[in-house]
């Protein structure tokens, strides 16, 4: 078989036992030929497994993979360098108990406490070594699970941005767009009422009230005018009030949100009496003008 024309795929070599070498095993394996069993095998101490030669890989068939050794089986045979009278090597059978003992001793030697250099390193018991290994496995699993969750979330977010064509949008902006909490309506802050001295068309907090005083007075004056016993003085007063009302209404340029122009000469007796808006305001005005401070 030519290597350049026909060779095994890379997957079969990666899954084979040649890439799963035991660091603590004392067995050394060299090469296997197609027709024979273990041709060159030797037993060493703490040297691990040796890779087979390239010729054995080239000369073997595609269906035959000699590197798939069953280490977890009950027994396996390894060649012995000690030879008998015959030229053939003798086979030595190693049971699974022997291999487990050697593995345990090598693991315990690696996990010994090196804090006291003066004393000899004592091997740990099997329970301590197993507990130590289990703790390391749990820590690694917890660490990798957290990393996998973070990566999963980031992948989901990236896929969502790609599907919705929002690659430039940040996570906080997406969260604000999809937030289900209703926004509270901003309440309008009502301003406090203030005593404003008006000298023109200035805005005030309160709306202008209707001139009810004018209407009531006009109704009363109409009733008085219908009376037969109305004097000449009342009729002259009525004419003056009507003329003043007409003059005020014609020159009124104010609206409901502004303070009207107040002229003392144009106002009648009822309008000149300005009272405060509340009892509290009246008391404050009385205290202001009566105090000697």
Curated annotation (Swiss-Prot):
Q: Does the keyword GTP-binding apply?
A: no
Its predominant location is cytoplasm
User: Which residues does the annotated region (Disordered) include?
Assistant: 239-260
Q: Mind naming one GO cellular-component term on file for this protein?
A: nucleus
Q: Where is the composition biased (Polar residues)?
A: 246-260
Which InterPro entries does the UniProt entry name for this protein?
A: TF_Nrm1/Whi5
Provide the leader sequence positions.
none
Q: What does this protein do?
A: Negative regulatory component of the MBF complex involved in cell-cycle-dependent transcription.
Sequence similarity: Belongs to the WHI5/NRM1 family.
How it assembles, according to the record, is: Component of the MBF complex.
Q: What is this protein called?
A: Transcription factor NRM1
Q: Which gene encodes it?
A: NRM1
